[in-house]
Amino acid sequence: NNFTIYDADDQKTLMKEICRKMNIDTKKVRERALLAQISHAKDELLNPDEMEVNAGADFNQKRAAQVYREYQAALRRNNALDFDDLIVKTVELFQNCDDVLQTYQERFRYIMVDEYQDTNTAQFKFVSLLASRYENLCVVGDDDQSIYKFRGANIGNILGFERVFPNAKVIRLEQNYRSTQNILDAANGVIANNTERKEKTLWTENPEGEKIHFRQFMNGYEEAEYVVGDIAKRHREGMADYHDCAVLYRTNAQSRLFEEKCLHANIPYKIVGGVNFYARKEIKDLLCYLKTVDNAADDLAVRRILNVPKRGIGATTVGRVQDYADMMNISFYDALR
């Protein structure tokens, strides 16, 4: 059967409906927070029942497990999967159907995995099952760069790789081609404090380069004021042109303070990057039309395009159709018919 893959916006819309039905106040418990708990459970290959057992007396975890159960039921009704399900369902298929597993083991005899330090438990299980027959597995990763535990990454996957695959050959790539030695020395000094890591020392044939300057600030406002002030000073004293300066930041939200300070100081700037193509409204609308054609049971897609372009259909009418669909236990599309 055809099925729809829900992206982050689809998941949030679905979770909002579930919270409404379960009388959960989304001002106190955010949809994103519940989805993150569910995603973490799927990363660990836990179903709703297992998550509830693990919750013990933790009220928040128990509630998340109950929401998880309703969330999965809603996905089934809509004939949809989320991104985590693509791995989880494949692992379940491989574990329960040996013939299917063998088919794909024959198809993919040689497997390569990049950024292995960022893999979660479900991904590790998936790769282990697929590679278990021929063990032609090459993974590339750096345990020192494992920073995504909050997203479910399990550093044990790379630290314990030789234990799971005892015949593996480990090749350390310690020469760096991008950075100066001063930058590498600083990095080596910081990461040496980590007691659970694979020993390695980065080095380069590049020049030593300039010394690193470290500044620490109480908040983002102080940081932006200092950085923009330093750029203005360098330009004023003829040390650098504006186009010689770049500010790197991890999240888009951080750019606002720097932009405000640049505007205040009359410093021209350019933001590199923009809205993701598939996150644009018109693209999502078009994709939902295609989803509806392919899978009319996808309520989220049907409701999104119902009034695109505008047809004078209000929220009250949509609500009545949804109530009828819920009462008759049919899809939103069938209720419209």
Predicted features along the sequence, with ranges:
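Conserved P-loop NTPase-based nucleic-acid remodeling module centered on helicase motor cores
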Residues: N1-Q37, K42, L46-A55, Q66, ...
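Helicase P-loop NTPase motor core
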Residues: P166-K169, E174-P268, K291-N295, M327
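Short alpha-helix plus adjacent loop in nuclease-associated cores
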Residues: N1, D144-R151, R178-S179, I271-D294, ...
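Short, well-structured alpha-helical segments
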Residues: K28-S39, Q61, A65, D84, ...
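Conserved helicase C-terminal RecA-like lobe
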Residues: V53, A57, S255-I267, R280, ...
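Conserved helicase NTPase motor core
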Residues: A57-G160, L173-S179
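Residue-level signature of catalytic and energy-coupling elements of molecular machines
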Residues: M15, I38, D82, D114, ...
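Proline-centered turn/helix-capping motifs that create local helix->coil transitions or kinks
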Residues: T26-K27, K42-P48, V190-T201, D326-Y333
